[in-house]
């Protein structure tokens, strides 16, 4: 017969089941344990839930029907989320009451029941007090505002005088800092930036090197020592005497020459060399500068003429359209859609910083475009009409965008000023809104606490599932050895960290514990730790928590996770999703279940498949169906597969919304496999919104 591969990854020997070998790679991402656990949970849930429904409801028409069970896993391996999609979800929780549980779980259940009842009593009292406090605060704040206005009219307190003195001192320090910065900038300008001149050509600003200005002594000295030794010697013999006699105020005797330092000699020599070089290069630089200035002027004049031409062209086309149609309908010929001004309607929803970024990016692109036009003009001496027209459109769009941003800024400033005036009125409205929220939350909590019995049943069911998973993990312990070792290592690290940072976390310094007995140390540690945890538990979500509180909470969570992983106990959460009757009929799992029931009742498979297909095609949402049945059909000796299709079922398109289910029917003749595909149209692709980046990509 050979070997078959199990869908989960087992290589199963048909004759020798004890020789089944695991061959898939499961060391990464703990794939083995998650797949086995999911399969195990799904099997148990599909067995257990129908039994509970029959006990409670006894085949009544309101009995909940499960469409499918989804198991979701988070990043943390011990967390398991179970999503049950079914009809009449409110009946499922009541059905958990008939679950037979071990006596150990009953003790935990009673504890949980007491905790829930206590919380219900506390929460109702808290919400009543909160409503009274908010009403009192409304009256108190009105009186406080009146008192504050009277204090402002009267004289200043001591605190006010101190604040004025502090403000004056801060102003003085600010002025001194500004003066210091100015001096530093002036020194920097003298030393380093003195050799550059800022030149403005139209709207373009550039920096040019000024050859007339003196170089710094350091640069001269470096360039001097780069010369050869022979050149230096000849340079000193020829130039030193003349330069020294003209510039220095010393005597011409040999004694004074010997006393002068080498640095001074080098400086004097290079001043003369610089003057001589400047005199030689003056005519060349003058010619180049004059030629470039003339070409730039001619380029700017030509570009202005082109821009004026295109501006007149736009105005003429606009007037013609207004005369014909009575409004400006169409852009002139050759204009691009992306530079259309109607685009600003989309920009209304965009935030202001994003618009500023867009403006800067477009400005840089426009400068690059201008540089290309200048190069083309230098080479050919003319402009291409299409390029100048595109540049004109870009510049026109930029000008309008600048105006649009300025308008947005003015609107924001006006809104801000209005909000400051309306703050007092907003406070009262906010407080009224808070009262409404408090009343609504109170009602919601009352609903929840009225259904404590159902919550108790769900806790019982979760405990039962946790016990089942723990048994499964203990059987397959070889798959969980790596997680256990990792969690032990993490626990040790957490313990070391808490010991090192005990002063920051709990306020326990090792110096205070010196010289005490072990019993006294334990008592002090217990008291400090219990106090910190009590403070953290008292703080609600509305109150702001310190960095210390958040750190302690996270450490406690990590510790519990590690301990649970070592004990092989998972954290299971159950969520119920109600499914409508129309949606339930078009689910592949429900259709497969109905086919399996009919086949197990020994009905003819062709009639069953045909009926299921016709019923599905009558529903409006379904656009295609395919049903396949394989096995010993109608008790035939040779197994075969038969399938029926209606409409379209595109199995290779990714956008197709196809619901699929596979189930087995256990008949007298053997197992019959049932596969159902239901095609419900294509999934909707999202259109680009105003906030999406695809709106701005074509501009850049």
Curated annotation (Swiss-Prot):
Alphabetized GO MF terms: RNA binding; structural constituent of ribosome
Annotated localization: Plastid, Chloroplast
Xref: Pfam families: Ribosomal_S3_C
Ranges where the record places region Insert: 88-196, 282-587
Transmembrane intervals: none
SUPFAM superfamilies: Prokaryotic type KH domain (KH-domain type II), Ribosomal protein S3 C-terminal domain
A Gene Ontology cellular-component term: chloroplast
One GO term (biological process): translation
Keywords: Chloroplast, Plastid, Ribonucleoprotein, Ribosomal protein
Domain of life according to the entry: Eukaryota
Stated family: Belongs to the universal ribosomal protein uS3 family.
Oligomeric form and interacting partners: Part of the 30S ribosomal subunit.
Protein's name in the database: Small ribosomal subunit protein uS3c
Organism: Tetradesmus obliquus
Upper taxonomic lineage: Eukaryota, Viridiplantae, Chlorophyta, core chlorophytes, Chlorophyceae
């Amino acid at each position: 017969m050979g070997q078959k591969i199990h869908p989960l990854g087992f290589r199963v020997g048909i004759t020798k089941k004890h020789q089944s070998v695991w061959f898939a790679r499961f060391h990464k991402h703990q794939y083995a344990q998650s797949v086995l656990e999911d399969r195990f949970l799904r099997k148990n849930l599909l067995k257990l839930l129908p039994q509970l429904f029959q006990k409670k409801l006894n085949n009544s028409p309101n009995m909940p029907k499960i469409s499918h069970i989804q198991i979701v896993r988070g990043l943390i391996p011990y967390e398991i989320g179970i999503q049950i999609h079914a009809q009449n979800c409110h009946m499922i929780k009541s059905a958990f009451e008939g679950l037979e549980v071990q006596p150990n779980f009953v003790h935990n259940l009673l504890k949980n029941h007491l905790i829930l009842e206590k919380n219900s009593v506390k929460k109702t009292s808290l919400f009543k007090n909160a409503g009274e406090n908010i009403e009192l605060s409304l009256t108190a704040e009105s009186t406080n505002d009146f008192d504050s206005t009277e204090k402002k009219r009267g004289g200043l307190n001591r605190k006010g005088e101190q604040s004025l003195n502090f403000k004056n001192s801060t102003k003085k320090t600010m002025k001194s800092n500004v003066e210091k910065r100015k001096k530093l900038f002036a020194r920097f300008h003298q030393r380093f930036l003195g050799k550059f001149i800022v030149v403005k050509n139209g709207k373009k600003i550039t920096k040019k090197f000024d050859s007339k200005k003196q170089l710094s002594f350091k640069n001269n000295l470096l360039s001097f020592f780069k010369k050869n030794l022979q050149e230096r010697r000849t340079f000193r013999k020829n130039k030193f005497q003349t330069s020294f006699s003209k510039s220095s105020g010393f005597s011409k005797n040999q004694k004074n020459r010997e006393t002068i330092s080498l640095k001074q000699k080098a400086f004097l020599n290079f001043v003369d060399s610089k003057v001589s070089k400047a005199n030689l290069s003056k005519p060349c630089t003058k010619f180049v500068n004059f030629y470039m200035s003339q070409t730039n002027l001619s380029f700017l004049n030509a570009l202005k003429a082109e821009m004026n031409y295109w501006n007149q062209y736009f105005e003429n086309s606009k007037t013609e359209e207004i005369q014909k149609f009575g409004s400006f309908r169409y852009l002139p010929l050759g204009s691009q859609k992306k530079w259309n001004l109607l685009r600003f309607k989309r920009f209304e929803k965009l935030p202001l910083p994003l618009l500023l970024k867009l403006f800067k990016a477009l400005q840089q692109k426009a400068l690059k475009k201008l540089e290309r036009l200048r190069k083309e003009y230098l080479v050919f001496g003319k402009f291409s009409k299409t390029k100048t027209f595109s540049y004109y459109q870009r510049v026109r769009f930029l000008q309008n965008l600048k105006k649009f941003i300025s308008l947005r800024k003015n609107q924001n400033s006006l809104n801000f000023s209005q909000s400051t005036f309306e703050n007092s009125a907003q406070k009262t409205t906010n407080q009224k809104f808070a009262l409404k929220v408090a009343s609504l939350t109170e009602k919601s909590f009352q609903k929840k606490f009225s259904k404590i019995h159902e919550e108790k049943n769900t806790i019982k069911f979760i405990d039962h599932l946790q016990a089942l998973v723990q048994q499964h993990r203990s059987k397959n312990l070889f798959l969980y050895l790596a997680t256990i070792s990792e969690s032990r290592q993490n626990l040790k690290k957490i313990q070391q960290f808490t010991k090192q940072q005990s002063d920051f976390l709990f306020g326990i310094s090792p110096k205070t514990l010196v010289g005490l007995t072990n019993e006294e140390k334990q008592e002090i540690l217990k008291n400090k730790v219990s106090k910190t945890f009590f403070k953290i538990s008292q703080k609600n979500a509305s109150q702001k928590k310190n960095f210390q509180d958040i750190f302690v909470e996270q450490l406690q969570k990590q510790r519990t996770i590690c301990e649970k992983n070592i004990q092989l106990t998972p954290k299971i959460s159950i969520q119920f999703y109600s499914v409508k009757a129309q949606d339930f009929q078009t689910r592949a799992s429900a259709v497969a279940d109905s086919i399996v029931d009919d086949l197990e009742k020994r009905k003819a498979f062709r009639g069953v498949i045909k009926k299921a297909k016709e019923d599905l095609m009558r529903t409006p949402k379904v656009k295609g169906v395919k049903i396949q049945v394989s096995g010993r059909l109608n008790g035939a000796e040779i197994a075969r597969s038969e399938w029926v299709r209606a409409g379209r079922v595109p199995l290779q398109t990714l956008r197709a919304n196809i619901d699929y289910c596979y189930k087995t029917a256990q008949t007298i003749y053997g197992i019959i496999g049932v596969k159902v595909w239901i095609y419900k149209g294509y999934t909707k692709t999202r259109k680009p919104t105003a906030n999406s980046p695809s709106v701005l990509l074509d501009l850049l």
